Amino acid sequence: MAKEKGLISPEDFAQLQKYIEYSTKRVSDVLKVFDDGEMNRFCQGDAIGYLGFEQFMKMYLEMEEVPHHLCWALFWSFHTSQVAAEKTKSKANVICLSDVYCYFTLLEGGRPEDKLEFTFKLYDMDRNGILDSTEVEKIILQMMRVAEYLDWDVSELRPILQEMMREMDQDGSGSVSLDEWVRAGATTVPLLVLLGMDVTMKDDGNHIWRPKRFTRLVYCNLCEQSISLGKQGLSCNFCKYIVHDHCAMKAQPCEVSTYAKSRKDIGVQSHLWVRGGCHSGRCDRCQKKIRTYHSLTGLHCVWCHLEIHDDCLQAVGPECDCGLLRDHILPPCSIYPSVLVSGQECKHKTTDDTSLCTPEAFRIEPVSNTHPLLVFINLKSGGKQGQSVLWKFQYILNPRQVFDLKDGPEPGLRFFKDVPQFRILVCGGDGTVGWVLETIDKANFATVPPVAVLPLGTGNDLARCLRWGRGYEGENLRKILKDIELSKVVYLDRWFLEVIPQQNGEKSDPVPSQIINNYFSIGVDASIAHRFHLMREKYPEKFNSRMKNKLWYFEFATSESIFSTCKKLEESVTVEICGKLLDLSDLSLEGIAVLNIPSTHGGSNLWGDTKRPHGDTCEINQALGSAAKIITDPDILKTCVPDMSDKRLEVVGIEGAIEMGQIYTRLKSAGHRLAKCSEITFQTTKTLPMQIDGEPWMQAPCTIKITHKNQMPMLMGPPSNSYNFFGFWS
């Protein structure tokens, strides 16, 4: 296929992917036109010549003219296929449409069920609704071709594939029906992988270039000439291979292999040395300086990040232990295509979990006594921070451990679903963390993985409480990974929120979420947040820095303090805690907050500090009476310590925007501590602003019930003496 050396360059392949991304056509739609539509005249059975292929590409890419060199290279790539030779016999200048379909589908998304059904019909040449032995053999030939394309070791693959195909024939009829095909492909046999239609199996070998302006003198890995200080070149995210812009087209393929493609590569990881990139300036073998200013010199290992002299290479053994970050890394030797195992090993595990029940493209067997890290990154969080963090983690870890959340958390969780003792790192804001936690909840893991947070953007209340800081500001990610190793597991209570609207015809905004991880509030703070939210949606360019956001928030808070839109809130809200009415008659409130963690609004501690006696927080709270469902006694509330794991909520009254500002700046210690409870019900009589975990909305009169849902394991960062928990500019 297009991977054949000398036929299509990596640059042409990248351009082809862009063409496909911009096109609205699907390869299956175009194939139907050639199969029984107006383009059928170009077909010779399952084969097609160059003129027909050219028309196919124009229609598929929606282009009047496809670059001739690209179209020609693609055609001859397919033409050299072993499968094409088998199918077309003596037809010298034709290619197989089934090859074209499979490999272009590799670059597309789509529902697995649709792909399976269409592929069945593609190989059911006599259209009788079953796959007979001849058609099954053609499928096996195609699978062998895909395996060769992906550089797998195919020496023992054919008998494994034949056994898989026999097992699909569940009724023993000697043929495979559509139902058997779809059932096997959706549950046990990785058919989409074997037929080249699973995008998770995109092959290695392509550099992932990004432009970089170098702040130090470096040398091009191809021509070995310098790239001057302050000049721009290209750096590969995966291997740190550096080139001039004009040298990129001639660069050797990327040597990083993210998974084992042969049985002999499984279990033992070897060093992968790349010339240059020795930024520490000192050899890890002999401890002498590596003089990098005169030429391209030194070697660095992609996996353990050792830096050595060229002359020290012989003194370093071939086996790589992945270095200081071995606890987090899934080395390529731990990941291999599931089809490469034979016999009973290749039979996949069954599970009751339908959300993640798909046949695994890979088997993962991590190094013993390690805790592989699954990294989720929200590229929309924190401006351009997300993209920078993605690039860094793709180099520090195996790129297959790092997932952009544009496709949601499911692909990453599915990839790791059978990995023992893995951890998760979520790079994003509180909303991103909540999204990942909700997806984990639906995945029904037998053992739920603990979650750490790398906070991006503003707010980040949960990250503050878990000691991961107020927001990422370019710190060394290796230091953060070492902190994860030193972290401890704590359990975060999660609460279910049910909104029951009154039947009075008034409309409300959609409720952002039914799950509370951090806090819920009604009144003044939600009003400020709602105005902030509307303005940011209308003018996003005015909210592109942490400082600007704080100034806007200050402006809205000042306006709210003047107009007091939620004055006398107690007259329009009643509060029941565990069935007992909470008396608010002696208070004049503009807001009520229900806290699961002691940080809100980007660093405010509305509950306030409590002088802690020596001892465990849970034991202290029980001694003070928190074992009871309700605590409303003011004297006991003064000594209650917030605990995100105690299955209790703290209820706080807020007098107004001025009091909120005083608490934020530490001029006032806390709001009014009203209660500590395990269930709470609000009844409102007018439309009021509300918010869940910083997401505001306007809610018409309703009843709101909050009950405990479950607990999720989180990772608490190690203590830091310099950590400022509730500083004003945090």
From Swiss-Prot:
The keyword Phosphoprotein does not apply. Keywords: Acetylation, ATP-binding, Calcium, Cytoplasm, Kinase, Lipid metabolism, Metal-binding, Nucleotide-binding, Repeat, Transferase, Zinc, Zinc-finger. Residues 368-501 form the DAGKc domain. GO terms for biological process: diacylglycerol metabolic process; lipid phosphorylation; phosphatidic acid biosynthetic process; phospholipase C-activating G protein-coupled receptor signaling pathway. The modification N6-acetyllysine is found at K479. This is Diacylglycerol kinase alpha. Residues 111-146, 156-191 form the EF-hand domain. Its main location: cytoplasm. Its EC number is 2.7.1.107, 2.7.1.93.
